[in-house]
Amino acid sequence: MVRPSSPVASRRIVCFSHKTALEILTALPPSQKPQPMRSRKFPDQAPSLKDAQLASDRILEQCPALSLSRPLHVTSASTSHNHRTDVVEFHRSGKPFGGTGLLSLGEGTRVTSVPFTFVQMATSLSLIELLELGYELCGTYRRGKAGEPTRYHADPL
């Protein structure tokens, strides 16, 4: 059991979303795919900037080939952090959702599921970009990253 005074107990749950969730979900190898959660809402409290950075560091340790762009996108049900910094952009979503919207990466770290992330991205992408993302998520093809060629018939996320 974790004592309340320990650093682990004081950390808030970090839920990566939007572009950060896509980067994580596409980079993790099949052996490290996150586990579905039964939770139907985002964490009640927004994490601190430090908690978000620590969670990001843990993910990068698990997957050294991953590169997370900045700002990190983090969602919670709270409005305690509703601003954007160079490091983290906080999003708020207080309404419960159906299905499996969150996946566990362990150690108090969550990521939005592929379908949920697609819906989140719909607000910031053009129609063409959204169609490309939909094809990529469904396994039709995977866009190349940093000089890699586009792969067709890729596995769906």
Model-derived features: positions:
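Short gly/ser-rich loop at a beta-strand->alpha-helix junction or flexible surface loop bordering the NTP-binding
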Residues: 1-157
